[in-house]
Amino acid sequence: MRKLLVLCSFWLCVATLGAQNAERKLYSVAFYNLENLFDTIHDAGKNDYEFLPNGSYQWTAKKYESKLQNLSKVLGSLSRDLVPEGPAFIGVAEAENSRVLEDLVKQPAISNYEFVHYEGPDRRGIDCALLYDPKQFSVTHSKLVLSTPFEGDTVHLTRGFLIVGGQLAGERVCVIVNHWPSRGAKSPVRVHAARQVKALKDSLMRSDKKL
């Protein structure tokens, strides 16, 4: 089967993998928008001022900790009714930096997860990342591919494409985590993002015939 997954908004995929003659096992994967997971510390060069204690959201440590707890409960409950172990990996969007991801996976509900993240050029500092359970999914390589603007539009810009390769159930799997511009952007901007994802997918499948 094809084992290249594109994780973006509105997708929840459940796949069965395994050798043809082996007992088949159910795995789940997911995508979740963290919706502005910011800490309370200013990142130099980033426009994160709204999410500071003296910013417009009055973003305090108490509010931050509450958001971490609430997110971890939701993420920790994903697909548990079908797969007791939870998702093998979860693509996430709108994480400010590695610090917030470290704080997130320290929460008891998802303490079994690790993460892959690269700092991108987004002006507000929000990025995509991949949370993964190392007991189910073993990461072998990863990289961030920057997006190109549509006709010079740097306002509605896709926040990079996180590519993560690894082993799931003994088979090679490659994931593209991406977060397109909102529906407030013009349709051609979103189509441009889709075409970039397709080009990446095609390139990956040409270079690895086993995907």
Model features per residue range: what roles?
Residues 146-148, 154, 180, 187-191:
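Acidic/His-rich structured neighborhood in mature extracellular/periplasmic domains
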Residues 19-110, 118-126, 194-195:
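N-terminal, active-site-proximal structural segment of metallo-dependent hydrolase catalytic domains
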Residues 182-211:
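Flexible, glycine-rich surface segments
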Residues 1-22:
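Bacterial Sec-dependent N-terminal signal peptides
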Residues 28-36, 141-143, 172-182:
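Active-site-proximal beta-strand elements of phosphoester/diester hydrolases
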Residues 55-56, 160, 181-183:
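Flexible glycine/proline-enriched surface loops and loop-helix/loop-strand junctions
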Residues 91, 95-172:
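Structured beta-strand-rich core segments of catalytic domains in phosphoester-bond hydrolases
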